[in-house]
Amino acid sequence: MATLQDVHLRVNDRVTPVYFTARSFLLVSPKRAGQATFLAREEGTDNPVVTCHVSDFYKDGV
């Protein structure tokens, strides 16, 4: 069974919890022009679920 990840995304000064499993979503961090952007997408598709700059991406306990 995949582990449930609890990730908080800050959007417009509101922290929104984002839930996904490793089985359902892949988290990748493409680097463009020296900036890392995180992209959560459905596994096996190119449909983005949520994108944000690395500075707006938080994980509990980090």
Swiss-Prot record:
Domain of life: Viruses
Function: Needed for optimal phage development.
Protein name (Swiss-Prot/TrEMBL): Protein P14
Biological source species: Pseudomonas phage phi6
Classification lineage: Viruses, Riboviria, Orthornavirae, Duplornaviricota, Vidaverviricetes
